């Protein structure tokens, strides 16, 4: 039987405890999990791609079947390159579903083998988003219960650099 390989794509700017929860759960469901960190040109990320990959590795590196890859371009092309079984997406709210449903159908039009798997977050993470976390951190609020310690430290370094 062939191995199941799922891609969990995102900008992860920064990775949150919600992301960590989904990857941890996915690592029990799939043989291999690829955390695919998008360059994210259109989002003007706070953290560089290298920083985001390092933060993901420090937060999830203890999971032996999880790897971390930066990527650029269409997700459907990356899906094919990685010979993936499916793409994993988290759904926090109905509004997420509408967007993800449309995206999955478009990707399936581009590649009929494209499959999307949706997971809802554990309840305590259902309201967390990287955008909210960045805003709280920018205003020097306490984000320690929403992100891994490595991210807290990365925000502290950004503040020291004048962010």
Curated annotation (Swiss-Prot):
It comes from Acinetobacter baumannii (strain AYE). The lineage of its organism: Bacteria, Pseudomonadati, Pseudomonadota, Gammaproteobacteria, Moraxellales. Pfam families: CTP_transf_like (PF01467). ATP binds at residues 11-12, 19, 90-92, 100, 125-131. The gene is coaD. Its EC number is 2.7.7.3. It catalyses: (R)-4'-phosphopantetheine + ATP + H(+) = 3'-dephospho-CoA + diphosphate. Reversibly transfers an adenylyl group from ATP to 4'-phosphopantetheine, yielding dephospho-CoA (dPCoA) and pyrophosphate. GO terms for cellular component: cytoplasm. It is found in: Cytoplasm. InterPro entries: Cyt_trans-like, PPAT, Rossmann-like_a/b/a_fold. One of its GO terms (molecular function) is pantetheine-phosphate adenylyltransferase activity. The record marks 19 as: Transition state stabilizer. This is Phosphopantetheine adenylyltransferase. HAMAP family: PPAT_bact (MF_00151). Belongs to the bacterial CoaD family.
